[in-house]
Amino acid sequence: MASWSAPSPSLVEYFEGQTSFQCGYCKNKLGSRSYGMWAHSMTVQDYQDLIDRGWRRSGKYVYKPVMDQTCCPQYTIRCHPLQFQPSKSHKKVLKKMLKFLAKGEISKGNCEDEPMDSTVEDAVDGDFALINKLDIKCDLKTLSDLKGSIESEEKEKEKSIKKEGSKEFIHPQSIEEKLGSGEPSHPIKVHIGPKPGKGADLSKPPCRKAREMRKERQRLKRMQQASAAASEAQGQPVCLLPKAKSNQPKSLEDLIFQSLPENASHKLEVRVVRSSPPSPQFRATFQESYQVYKRYQMVVHKDPPDKPTVSQFTRFLCSSPLEAEHPADGPECGYGSFHQQYWLDGKIIAVGVLDILPYCVSSVYLYYDPDYSFLSLGVYSALREIAFTRQLHEKTSQLSYYYMGFYIHSCPKMRYKGQYRPSDLLCPETYVWVPIEQCLPSLDNSKYCRFNQDPEAEDEGRSKELDRLRVFHRRSAMPYGVYKNHQEDPSEEAGVLEYANLVGQKCSERMLLFRH
């Protein structure tokens, strides 16, 4: 079993107060309001806890809408993949893809009739404008001081832990690699032991009962589906596989991995490649992927040719603060940021940008070649991502949710995310999950709602002990209680308290808040 080194602490730079910019949904010039911070590096657990408090990332910029003030409140939404059953419209999209692959048939009619076809992504124009204006004070020279401070701090922890007989301790990685100019650090090499075989010969005995034969066919089908999904998780090409016949209703996997004739018109492969730090597969396909993004932005979002630049693409969809982590009990591909590439006949036609976190797969963005919009790639990719989450759950049981970003009830085009049931919305005041069916009546009456029906309920994860918050100041990591004793400006505490309440007690004690 390969050893695993825990990542260094997250390092963030919080921008005090609220920021107003043009809304990407209703186009209100100053209607969108949010809090924000720049994440120089972030652990996947910290980001998991942040999105469970209403935060979301755009590149390395992490923001949280001011829900009771912003023009279009954005509620975090998650789907339950393990209980998910495709609807009739979902099955229609999957069958349309199969017909196209098998016979080259192109569905007639207006592709815009599909509710998700060109609206699978969140609006980000306002974020880009904001990021360009950010005053980021934590530079590389300052960040290089973090390594020594963390190493010193963790050595003390290591001594203490060893005394207690613990087998694990933290090994800080090079802070220059993680937090530098945006150039990738070297991928972490993890030895993966040989995969278990498929067991004994599965040949059918001479005499077997019908029930036993059905069970055997079902077992073979599950093995085929697991094999295909496992290949996808490791970045290997995945083709549609033959399926075992069954009288049972078709599952999501049945519909996705349905058999194709040997002379099929097209071949679809799905590959998952790590985008940060960039894997060799990601580097090799970067230009082709960017060209798909550029065309998508120009055709679907009507961007001028000079707007979707390589720099913008990299900053928004390739750069990520998330550390690559490979714990023994995690998914084979590890945690972090990835691109799920859809290859049709040897060329990329769509890319889903994903974060794989301890408890979920989080969808960041989708872009595709507009020439293939008739395939309803927004719906198709969401269904593939749900199936991908189910596959990851097989090895990592706590990874059982599919986060679809934000649900925006006040914007009709963005209500499509509520079609993936069962799903929950995050209460913006108490940060508990509430079934979407219970939330919709309230949202029909008011665009901002508290979903938790208990009037006495409070935010249990709120900051309770400000002095335990961690800061990074003058080459040292320290508790806020120590830091404030050396500060002459008492007004600074208001901004620190605002940050602490927004990120919650757990994150405030783990993440390092940079102080200039």
Swiss-Prot record:
Domain of life: Eukaryota
Cellular compartments annotated: Nucleus; Cytoplasm
Region (Disordered): 150-206
GO terms classed as biological process: proteasomal protein catabolic process; ubiquitin-dependent protein catabolic process
Keywords annotated in UniProt: Acyltransferase, Cytoplasm, Nucleus, Transferase, Ubl conjugation pathway
Sequence ranges of Basic and acidic residues compositional bias: 150-180
Catalytic activity entry: an N-terminal L-alpha-aminoacyl-[protein] + L-arginyl-tRNA(Arg) = an N-terminal L-arginyl-L-aminoacyl-[protein] + tRNA(Arg) + H(+)
GO molecular function: arginyl-tRNA--protein transferase activity
InterPro entries in the cross-refs: Acyl_CoA_acyltransferase, Arg-tRNA-P_Trfase_1_euk, N-end_Aminoacyl_Trfase, N-end_Aminoacyl_Trfase_C, N-end_Aminoacyl_Trfase_N
EC number in record: 2.3.2.8
Keyword check for Zinc: no
Tissue-specificity statement: Widely expressed.
UniProt enzyme class: transferase
A GO cellular component annotation in the UniProt record: cytoplasm
Family per similarity comment: Belongs to the R-transferase family.
Subunit structure: Monomer. Interacts with LIAT1; LIAT1 is not a substrate of ATE1, the interaction takes place in the cytoplasm and seems to increase ATE1 arginyltransferase activity.
Function recorded in the entry: Involved in the post-translational conjugation of arginine to the N-terminal aspartate or glutamate of a protein. This arginylation is required for degradation of the protein via the ubiquitin pathway. Does not arginylate cysteine residues.
Protein's name in the database: Arginyl-tRNA--protein transferase 1
Gene name of the record: Ate1
